[in-house]
Amino acid sequence: MSIKTIKYFSTIIVAVVAVLAGWWLWNYYMQSPWTRDGKIRAEQVSITPQVSGRIVELNIKDNQLVNAGDLLLTIDKTPFQIAELNAQAQLAKAQSDLAKANNEANRRRHLSQNFISAEELDTANLNVKAMQASVDAAQATLKQAQWQLAQTEIRAPVSGWVTNLTTRIGDYADTGKPLFALVDSHSFYVIGYFEETKLRHIREGAPAQITLYSDNKTLQGHVSSIGRAIYDQSVESDSSLIPDVKPNVPWVRLAQRVPVRFALDKVPGDVTLVSGTTCSIAVGQ
């Protein structure tokens, strides 16, 4: 066999191998369930005061790890302690009035019908009921005052990291207005966005390999759930409630991306997870 013939067949073999390799790579890219568009996520808990007041104690700093139940901050207790004392006094007065009304009603019940009318007896009994209602209201007011006093101590509802802390001692806390957030340390998960053409290769429970962009470390996880709805950008509704269908190019169709949620099987101690950072995901590996 001549050298020319060998070169000819060698060129053909190399070309065939290149075509097959290109086809395999293209098929892997288009069909294999993997994506570079993955995000680390975690649940965040807003720390929101239930009462208003000046912050007199702050036991945390930004990015600090806290445990569930730890005291985070304290709001000035003085006005709530005064409210509790006032509620206790109101309850004592209501109980005294009730005792007085009971004594009067009992006295009238033992009087002869010649000395008291049925109307007067009914009035005494109704007065007892009214005083009992006052006692119940005073007890409710006291419970509310005690609850508000307890809310001046804000504790961590979950274990996690303090984030976006700009609050300082002396700041005024408003009821219902978040002060900062806690990133739940036990809630980390991964969201991957996959083309719809790859969903047929993804099943709940399937293993996945998750590579962090931050330090190139690889974690193991599995498919937790698959999104069931995405926004349709092709249709909009106007004021006349008639669908506004956007025109498109018939021969160009972009695959929609669907969110898939992954649970992390185990996170090594030397891995730092940061919610919002990027990762790549390969399913079935």
From Swiss-Prot:
Which Gene3D superfamilies did the record assign?
2.40.30.170, 2.40.50.100, Helix hairpin bin
Q: How does it sit in the membrane?
A: Single-pass membrane protein
Classification from the root reads: Bacteria, Pseudomonadati, Pseudomonadota, Gammaproteobacteria, Enterobacterales
Give the UniProt entry's GO cellular component terms.
membrane
What superkingdom does the record give? Bacteria
User: Pfam families from the xrefs?
Assistant: CusB_dom_1, HlyD_D23
Q: Could you tell me where this protein is found in the cell?
A: Membrane
Q: Which residues cross the membrane?
A: 6-26
**What is the protein name given in its UniProt record?**
Uncharacterized protein YdhJ
Record InterPro entries: CusB-like_dom_1 (IPR043602), CusB_D23 (IPR032317), MFP_Efflux_Pump (IPR050393), RND_pump_MFP (IPR006143)
Q: What biological process terms from GO does the record include?
A: response to toxic substance; transmembrane transport
Q: Gene symbol?
A: ydhJ
Q: Which family does it belong to?
A: Belongs to the membrane fusion protein (MFP) (TC 8.A.1) family.
Keywords tagged on the record: Membrane, Transmembrane, Transmembrane helix
Q: Name one GO molecular function term.
A: transmembrane transporter activity
